[in-house]
């Protein structure tokens, strides 16, 4: 009877196109009923008394409907939510181990902070393959912190085993391993056609001439370089002092300590201006050769770029989006609030230019709060008053839809020449364009050389353009825009396919992240450089939400505020469904986008280390009930909660849910919470938690809250 029910049930399911568990249950229930009916009729003896050969034949007949039902397993998985649950189960199982470590990603040569949960443990030591074990710092409540810069792992490995010794008992964990290829950024030009640029991803500084480039490892994350006095000066993100590279290639730390957290640097003569976002946000101005500090000033927002405009310094920030003009001693001379932060900056004594996705407040109000319109804005170098605004996105005959755009997308780097012409690298449409004060705009497609130029510099009659994504540079004649030379510092796609296929997946996913969609926007439009623009947007919804940083997402499924995306690769649907997809096919974009996003590490916190205060902060974290949802070691349980149970004043759909985020990399990510209501972490614990449902923060003293904020900023 079981055989008959199975055969008949599969046949009914196949014929009906069953694609859910409910439909399968109905099909087999109907089959069972029909067989029962048959057994009560004269057909029963014949069915029950089938010969062995006839039974085998019946089984073979069942193969066809079985295969038909099996072919719809993906639809079945989607209908029942199994596809969504699978990644979450995997990540939860990893975090639920008695001894667990997070994040699940090790980046070669990159400083990282890992957390281990080992309840009741006294001593924890963590060993990465090829490295001596590191003793972890106990923060209390079974939570341990490990600061490491793994260097001994074979760079070809895609995953590695990490050993965790807990009071002598050894536990193993398997973590993803990523060894980034060089990403040339921040091209600077010196005398006699010398150039330099940094690759923070691979921890290198490149220098020389285009046809004979050399590289030198610089620990701590080289963030920017500049030529001063015949030497190359390098600002390092994780180290407090500048690094210099002499002509013969020797390296030495020099000059006054500026503090950790350098993000940008510019030079003018012997002067250096460094923007930093470490334990403090500051602009530091030095006379490099004299070794003296000319000025140091606090900055309210998160610094993005810095440039000299003659005897003045221009600084761009996000959170708030702002353009600032400062004197050499750091004093604020003028400022201008922006609708969206500047994605690129160039300055000269005659003009300042920025690239942004929205400069005109009225246009943004009229066209929606997720409106993206790439624009170039020229401003007066004395008053910051705008003198010219040029939307750059445009449509060519390659597009089918009137609203589509495929040129002038994603201006990522700007440079002025001596004739006030502005050269613009468009990362999202792979082109270089020249905007002149008194001549038509000219441009050249660089797509046949590399994808996504993200750097540009002027060297006499030569324009240098570089692609961080493809690891390549070209030189162009400044007048004709013809390519005259090229160089490569990273492997080609063909070399990666042969030697490191996963790194090719990462590169192709990075391309999808920066590539413009038919609607003219890209992931980079809001997630500047993989981080955030610090603004609140919506994508197809009614409620604004702050842009999330996309670094450190590996192992934290599901994704987005409501957890509606089960896999990182599923975020590709945003580009397809909301922005009409891409013009060019590029293989399995889901898989490559997932590979890229999973390769992005959590930045090391640059907050001051104070173990005693961290321990007090974690204790307040536990007493307030934060660990109930944000449990170590990932500081999330990967659960969802109805929004109104936590924020009863939430104006959206009462059924809206909130995916519990991991509380890593919070420093400098304001605004906070699902709707950006908190402008600081302290507000998260006070005014933004008026109902006291987002943790029992009322039970904390003022000192407790200060310690808790300190702890959160170190994660």
Walk through the language-model features, giving the residues of each.
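Low-complexity "stalk/linker" and mucin-like segments enriched in Ser/Thr/Pro/Ala/Gly
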Residues: 101, 129-141
């Amino acid at each position: 009877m079981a055989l008959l029910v199975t055969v008949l049930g599969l046949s009914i399911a196949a014929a009906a196109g069953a694609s859910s568990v409910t439909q399968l249950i109905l099909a087999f229930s109907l089959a069972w009923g029909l067989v029962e009916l048959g057994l009560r009729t004269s057909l029963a003896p014949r069915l029950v008394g089938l010969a062995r050969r006839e039974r085998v034949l019946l089984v073979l007949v069942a193969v066809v409907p079985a295969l038909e039902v099996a072919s719809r397993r993906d639809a079945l998985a989607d209908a029942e939510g199994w596809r969504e649950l699978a990644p979450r189960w995997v990540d939860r199982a990893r975090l639920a181990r008695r001894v667990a470590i997070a994040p699940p990603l090790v980046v070669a040569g990159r400083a990282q902070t890992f957390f281990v949960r080992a309840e009741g443990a006294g001593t924890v030591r963590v060993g990465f393959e090829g490295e001596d074990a590191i003793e972890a710092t106990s923060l209390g409540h079974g939570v341990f912190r490990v600061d490491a810069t793994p260097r001994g792992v074979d760079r070809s490995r895609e995953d590695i085993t990490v050993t965790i010794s807990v009071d002598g008992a050894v536990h193993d964990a398997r973590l993803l391993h990523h060894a980034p290829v060089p990403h040339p950024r921040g091209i600077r030009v010196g005398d006699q056609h010398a150039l330099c640029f940094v690759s923070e991803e691979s921890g290198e500084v490149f220098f020389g001439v285009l046809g004979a480039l050399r590289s030198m490892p610089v620990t701590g994350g080289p963030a920017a370089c500049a030529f001063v006095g015949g030497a190359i000066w390098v600002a390092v993100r994780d180290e407090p002092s500048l690094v210099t590279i002499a002509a013969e290639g020797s390296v030495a730390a020099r000059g006054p300590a500026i503090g950790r957290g350098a993000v940008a640097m510019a030079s003018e003569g012997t002067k250096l201006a460094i923007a930093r976002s470490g334990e403090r946000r500051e602009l530091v101005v030095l006379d490099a050769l004299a070794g003296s500090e000319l000025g140091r000033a606090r900055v309210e927002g998160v610094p993005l770029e810095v440039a000299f405009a003659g005897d003045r310094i221009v600084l761009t920030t996000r959170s708030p989006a702002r353009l600032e003009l400062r004197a050499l001693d750091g004093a604020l001379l003028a400022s201008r609030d922006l609708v969206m932060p500047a994605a690129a900056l160039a300055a000269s004594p005659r003009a300042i230019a920025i690239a942004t996705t929205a400069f005109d407040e009225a246009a943004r109000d009229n066209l929606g709060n997720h409106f993206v319109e790439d624009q170039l804005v020229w401003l007066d170098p004395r008053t910051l008053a705008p003198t010219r605004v040029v939307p750059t996105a445009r449509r060519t005959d390659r597009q089918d839809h009137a609203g589509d755009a495929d040129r002038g997308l994603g201006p990522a780097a700007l440079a002025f020449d001596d004739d006030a012409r502005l050269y613009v690298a468009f990362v999202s449409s792979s082109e270089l364009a020249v905007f002149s004060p008194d001549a038509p705009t000219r441009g050249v497609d660089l797509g046949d050389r590399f994808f996504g130029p993200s750097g540009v510099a002027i060297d006499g009659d030569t324009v240098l353009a570089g692609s961080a994504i493809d690891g390549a540079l070209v030189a162009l004649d400044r007048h004709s825009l013809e390519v005259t030379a090229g160089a490569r510092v990273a492997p080609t796609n063909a070399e990666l396919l042969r030697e490191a296929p996963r790194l090719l997946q990462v590169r192709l996913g990075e391309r999808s992240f920066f590539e413009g969609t038919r609607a003219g926007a890209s992931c980079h439009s809001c997630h500047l450089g993989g981080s955030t623009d610090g603004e609140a947007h919506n994508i197809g919804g009614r409620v604004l939400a702050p842009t999330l940083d996309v670094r450190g997402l590996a192992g934290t499924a599901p994704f987005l505020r409501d957890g509606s995306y089960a896999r990182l690769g599923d975020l590709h649907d945003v580009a397809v469904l909301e922005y009409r997809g891409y013009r060019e096919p590029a293989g399995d974009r889901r898989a490559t986008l997932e590979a890229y996003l999973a390769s992005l590490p959590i930045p090391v916190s640059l907050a001051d280390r104070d173990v005693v205060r961290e321990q007090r902060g974690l204790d307040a974290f536990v007493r307030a009930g934060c660990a109930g949802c944000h449990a170590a070691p990932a500081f999330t349980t990967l659960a969802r909660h109805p929004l109104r149970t936590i924020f009863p004043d939430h104006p959206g759909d009462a059924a809206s849910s909130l995916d519990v985020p991991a509380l890593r990399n919070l420093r400098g990510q304001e605004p906070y919470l699902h709707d950006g209501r908190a402008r600081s972490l302290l507000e998260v614990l006070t005014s933004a938690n008026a109902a006291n449902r987002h943790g029992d923060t009322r039970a904390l003293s003022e000192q407790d809250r200060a310690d808790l904020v300190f702890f959160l900023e170190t994660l």
